[in-house]
Curated annotation (Swiss-Prot):
Keyword DNA-binding: yes
Protein name, per record: ATP-dependent DNA helicase MPH1
Subcellular location: Nucleus
Biased composition (Basic and acidic residues): 42-57, 178-188, 891-900, 1041-1055, 1077-1093
Phylogenetic placement of the source organism: Eukaryota, Fungi, Dikarya, Ascomycota, Pezizomycotina
Database matches in InterPro entries: FANCM/Mph1-like_ID (IPR039686), FANCM_DEXDc (IPR044749), Helicase/UvrB_N (IPR006935), Helicase_ATP-bd (IPR014001), Helicase_C-like (IPR001650), P-loop_NTPase (IPR027417)
Ranges annotated as biased composition (Acidic residues): 189-199
Gene that produces this protein: MPH1
GO cellular component: nucleus
Protein purpose: ATP-dependent DNA helicase involved in DNA damage repair by homologous recombination and in genome maintenance. Capable of unwinding D-loops. Plays a role in limiting crossover recombinants during mitotic DNA double-strand break (DSB) repair. Component of a FANCM-MHF complex which promotes gene conversion at blocked replication forks, probably by reversal of the stalled fork.
Domain Helicase C-terminal, chain residue ranges per copy: 675-846
Main subcellular location of this protein, as a coarse class: nucleus
Amino acid sequence: MADDGCSGLSDFITDDELFNEVTLNEVSDSQTGRPTKRRRLNSHEINTDSTGRREIEEAGTDSDTFDPSLPPNSKTTGRGRKSNDDNPAARKPKTYTPKYHVDQKPLFVTQTQPSSSPSRIRGPRWKAPERNKPSTVSKAKQKSPLPAIWGRKPSTIGSHGTNGKDIDAAIAASLRSFEEEQSARGDAEMLDDSIEEPGDTQVHATPGPVTNAEKETIFDFEDIPDDAFDFEPEFTETADKEPILISSQPRPSQNTTRRPTASQSTSFRQTTLLGGFASSSSKRSSQPATQTWPSSSRNEPPTHHELNKDALRTWIFPKNLGSRREYQFNIAHRALFHNLLVALPTGLGKTFIAATVMLNWFHWTKDAQIVFVAPTKPLVSQQVDACFHIAGIPRSQTTLLTGNTPPGVRAEEWRSKRVFFMTPQTIMNDLKTGIADPKRIVLLVVDEAHRATGAYAYVEIVKFLQRFNNSFRVLALTATPGATVEAVQEVIDGLSISRIEIRTEKSLDIRGFVHQRNVETITFENSRDMITSMELFAKALQPVVDRLRNQNAYWGRDPMALTPFGLTKARQEWNSSPAGRAASWPVKGTINSMFTVLASLAHAIDLLKYHGIGPFYRNLVSFEDSVLKEKKGGKCASQIVADGNFKVLMSKLRSWTNTEEFIGHPKLEYLRRAILNHFLDAGGKNGGDSEGSDSNTRVMIFSHFRDSAEEIVRVLRKHQPFVRPHVFVGQANAKGSEGMDQKTQLEVVGKFKTGTYNTIVATSIGEEGLDIGEVDLIICYDGHSSPIRMLQRMGRTGRKRAGNIILLLSKGKEEESYSKAKDSYEKMQQLIASGSRFTFHTDKSSRIVPQDIQPEAEEKMIEIPIENSQLGLPEPAKRSRAPKRPPKKFHMPDGVEKGFTKASRLGRTNTDSNGRSKRKRVVRTPSPELEEFPDLGDLCANQSQELADDPDFQEIAGKQIPRLRMDVYPEHQRSLRPTGFIEHGKYTRRVVKTFRKISKLGFDCEAQYRAIVGDPDDDGEGLEGLSTDREDDPQSVTAHQSREQPPRVEKRCGTEELSSLDIEAFFPNLAWPARPEAPRPESDGTDNRDQKPSQRKKRYMISDDSDVFE
């Protein structure tokens, strides 16, 4: 038990003398130069008849949950300890005198000092330790003699002189306290001299000291657990060049499943560098270390995509760019089987990884579709180039669709192509209208994935696809996943991410591909002109701020501390406060107007502080014009403009900005000198006209606002052609500034790469993902509190060669914001790598590939098809007339019952609740085919003959039916008889009209006919001169007869030809009554032959509704 004794007292030794065998020098009070160390012991600690429980407890313990390894309560130790009047022995001090001599300096210890937190050593405080159940090893130790201390024999323990018994009791109590602490934590005891045989669980105590040879062979390596040396240090602040351990880097434990051995025990535990004990139950990474893919216990339904079994045997890694990079190889392999979020610094090949994954899924499936989405068209075009010239995806199978493509053309492309490069809004519209089939999509690649928060189109696309398709892969690419834990978790939830692969510039596997970037931070004080402007502007705004303070709506006093966000929050709080709710409408309107005016002017304050006098002056000019000319802002704005301080300020600003050489901010002067020095150091003297000039070096400047970007360009243009700057902004038009469409943006980027421009001043449009080219110097004109934007800016340089970054910050808020962004980025990288704060969606990440298939990597050169050498993007050709938009199509998820379902059948499957099967649908027998129709002429002739010969047609019930006669009831034939429900038809009216005309014909109709038409035997000579008048009234006929010119024959049609027939021959039985002639209308003597048909008077107009006859 000698070894156990050393282990038991090892906690009393400091860190710098751990496990050193020492002996205390036997010195007396007269030999030492300092007083002896005194230790005060309670009476119950040295009581010989005390049980093991009382010996463990220190004096003054409050409860049973007190940990004996911790320092005692302050009320019971030291000077503040209360005395026990009932036990006078407790007041008597005990002197501890060392008896053993050592070569080292004497060491005096009074109590154990654990290096870890109490909850980590003894467990939670609400759980009392199980002290009544000592382990078997503890009992064996109690029966064995006390171990040798510092190499001495056990017999020497009792030789302490006068106080020997007290010292022995104190040491024994300390040993038992340590043993009880170990058993209370449930951990195994420290190593003793017992050797455990395989399969034997009994402890064999071997008394006596342990030699050094025995110590070397005492370990049984089979008893060491697999994770004994899987130590993962906590993240601490490291130097810039110190690597950061990340969870996604390969570890042996992540590729194999741990299998415990037969003799595995808990006799060993891992010690941290700080002296504590590592906790094996803590969650170490976002990816479980013991899980292999695919999981044998996870049963997934087979995919509905048609897979290519031959191609699934391998997965292709292109070598067109040269030697492979291990991090790209590992990330691409994991992206084939997981919904992966890839976080890589800019310029490290995220586009190549996406092209590799797209190529493999293109070969693995036969007709499934692959979609790549990016927020802007320039980002989409970058991926198109990688897929064509690196992955070798055929151009004929790809297309680029944006909102400018007509829906009819997009529908045709969705039916014929397999690889699509789109903007997120376009694909979302195609999915909603049914143009795109969500069930055919097998891979969705998302660029700039940090945007996938809230209701952005990325999130809506994934949600829509999951409604119809449970077998598709998601690959998300970004350089900065998020600024907070909540933002990263929102991205994980929105895209159903199951794994994260993250790398930083300090990661071991990418250090060889990241060039050094020197970051230089420069801070600036406000200039005299800026201070003067701030003072005048503050005096102009002070009355408005005081009015808000008097209304308890705003608590700030300094107008220069106004911010748009602060004013917005103050307005919301005042409106929701009792004072705001109880205020009258005029008061509310006045206060809200003041908040609005101050919020607009707070932006001008930011421009003055961080961007200079020029942008500040232009903002105030716009504000002044809106008040004086457009009459906006109300009384509050008019009061500010009319203030004397404001007028003095505008006068000074106007005089300063009219000076050509005026520079409104110290940042701008430093920026100008830094750019000139950079080009001079690069060897350029003639602006790139000679060899060795600055034609190979580029500078990029980032500014948050367009006003400051244009101010920078104005200053730099004075040094042309040495410095050739150009502004680079977004598409939207701003007040006083025009936007740049995507075509213009690509042209500017192309000229920047070729050297036409060597300096670009960009807003946020140049931050995300755009391949600007090789930039040697990055200047951030203003700091930003967002780590995403900060890292996007810095990632523009240091890709193929070393780069420099200059940060221009104003002292105060801007400097603090940058520091906060930097710390937030580093902390987020650690949290993402650990994965301990995120929840991943492994249940929504199906493998798609069958579990019995394990594709093997195949590295090879990809043969690029000849069709990929064509210039331009694979956009559909423009047509003179676009195809019609197809009707909206509703896609249904699998297993959905289509059609109408009764309420009684809801929730039922093939059988009802009683076990009865559904009623089978009645199948109707097909009706016999119809015979061909006979010829209509033959049919009519046969029917007429049959009716004439059929006696049944003429007789009903033995009575003969008279034949139809047209000569009876003539009065009824010339009138429309009353009807009940159905009106008279068109043909009925015509027949009645015809009979009316016939009835009006007199007995002299033949003579009248001959007079008008002429002799029927005439050969038609002289017909050219006949009249073509269509009037039929007798007066008109008489007028024509009186003319000397020969009459003209007028062709008549219809029933009017009946006037020349002999009516009596047709109706011999009719008695024709003598009818008086109708009065003829007097002629006005005008000739109607030249009138238009619509202007002529119509004769014989019969009302169809008239039933009255003469």
